Amino acid sequence: MIAGQVSKPLLSVRSEMNAELRGEDKAATSDSELNEPLLAPAESNDSEDTPSKLFGARGNTVLPDPGTPDQHQACQTHPTFPVGPQPLLTAQQLASAVAGVMPGGPPALNQPILIPFNMAGQLGGQQGLVLTLPTANLTNIQGLVAAAAAGGIMTLPLQNLQATSSLNSQLQQLQQLQLQQQQQQQQQQQQQQQQQQQPPPPPTSQHPQPASQAPPQSQPTPPHQPPPASQQLPAPPAQLEQATQPQQHQPHSHPQNQTQNQPSPTQQSSSPPQKPSPSPGHSLPSPLTPPNPLQLVNNPLASQAAAAAAAMGSIASSQAFGNALSSLQGVTGQLVTNAQGQIIGTIPLMPNPGPSSQAASGTQGLQVQPITPQLLTNAQGQIIATVIGNQILPVINTQGITLSPIKPGQQLHQSSQTSVGQAGTQGNLLHLAHGQAATSHSPVRQASSSSSSSSSSSALSVGQLVSNPQTAAGEVDGVNLEEIREFAKAFKIRRLSLGLTQTQVGQALSATEGPAYSQSAICRHTILRSHFFLPQEAQENTIASSLTAKLNPGLLYPARFEKLDITPKSAQKIKPVLERWMAEAEARHRAGMQNLTEFIGSEPSKKRKRRTSFTPQALEILNAHFEKNTHPSGQEMTEIAEKLNYDREVVRVWFCNKRQALKNTIKRLKQHEPTSAAPLEPLADSPEENC
């Protein structure tokens, strides 16, 4: 998705473009009418510079005459394109496009505007980005002051932006298309220079055809040089594919055969559904490729979203802010917001050191990639979930254990007065945070280092550290992880060979070593152990220390040792205890099974009471007594028990359970009806009475 504000100077920019193209439209023949836009109104006229003209087709631009090189260099034109979106959008059209999307009616023009790309139709499977401008005046944004000089057009290099893992393959395809565009431009420039030096071929060598179709068949299409942002923006990649299609067939075929067997570029662009482009890049998915216009005619919102998609394609190669992107290199995280725009958490990012495909053209690419898995924190800095791929795993907060918030003083130093750019998807938007809104940034600078500190590693379990290739064969806090893993594997084999269960081991350890080694302690999972995988790179010293300090020390021993769900320090502490106990158990087993049983011992089993089932007649009598008196006396309960032939304890428990069920029902009713009638008499079980 693209969101943002495009100021009113765009109208003047479009007027200048129409003024330059108005003179060439007079030389167009009737064949150029095949390029009328499918998304623009049919009654649109070139003489009217209205905001609706911004969605006109590029087909109205006629290829210049080869004999006029001055005009050819002064105003570069693009080949015909069936979709017809313009890369320039006005604020009024953006507001009308999202009038039915954002709650609360059409948004004001001084507020951030969002255009969802992933909608019904061809745009449903696309993943997009959202750019939100925090202020209406672009000149207030540090590092983007060049927007005023460029006529209020804000362009950012998005070709290398990796907001989520699902965008990586599509963005790589976009980079390949842009690289093909550059190569094709170089070839076109060379051919154009040669044709300017030599006279054009006589028109008698070809079949008679209109003058507007002769230049694209007898000579290559003029190259597409990126003009300044104040005059014209480059064409989307889909246009570049169709522009290079006729030139790929021209050197290998005779002009006469090309005239008979191959339609003109104008005819190819006017009927794409009947004959799709054979370009290999056209069949691959790309988030910036506009959809099929025939499926969007009856959907004006999707049509304008398609125009915004084309605008995003032109933004990808614009050089308007090539020199003002130094401040954008400090992007350190993503802000995750809900559908109402409320910030619910952050995801750390790290710079991507890979080279930019646009380095030759001088555009500086903003290269960032997310850490996988990602640590998600809320506005207070508390860890609330982890993101692995496209799945968000929520944190299951253990009762009695609270997550320690990250203090603002422990964050990375940020540059003051930096704008907040947002990038998102449908449902929950992912925002690129590089400013004051990121009060819960995670340490991405520590993420780039090869190893973290010992305190952050100690917050992870042995199993997580062993699975990490960076720390699998190393030591953490002086503990050999490989040794711990081998001991846990051998301990399980030795336990099974003795025919012992984990319950028996826990009972024996609890009797000899204390309750910290009981079965309940061994089976208990410490917070953020088995439920989540917190990346070592995303851990911070303060997070690890604060979490460890707030946890009960008794919880650090356990976590099941055999599953390596235990911290290295705890594993190092419990290892000699288990080794000593297992050696003695094996010695008892060799002496005889009876000695092993005596050594293990057995706690007296607590026999569960049989559940009482009441007959319908008994339930009817009990309910009748409960309606009369919810707290019967001891003598009354004895009489009821004798009448129903039940134990008095069974009757007493039934009344206690019935009173508790009634209190729960009253509590639920009060939640649904806050302004209820006079409150009922509170029901309480007094220990002095019957319970």
From Swiss-Prot:
Keywords associated with the record: DNA-binding, Homeobox, Nucleus, Transcription, Transcription regulation
Keyword Transcription regulation assigned: yes
Q: Where in the cell is it found?
A: Nucleus
**Molecular function terms, GO-annotated:** DNA binding; DNA-binding transcription factor activity
The residue ranges flagged as biased composition, category Low complexity, are 188-197, 206-216, 238-272, 448-458
Q: Where is this region: Disordered?
A: 1-61, 188-297, 435-461, 670-691
Record field: compositional bias (Polar residues): 437-447
Please state what the protein is called. POU domain, class 6, transcription factor 2
Q: What is the lineage of its organism?
A: Eukaryota, Metazoa, Chordata, Craniata, Vertebrata
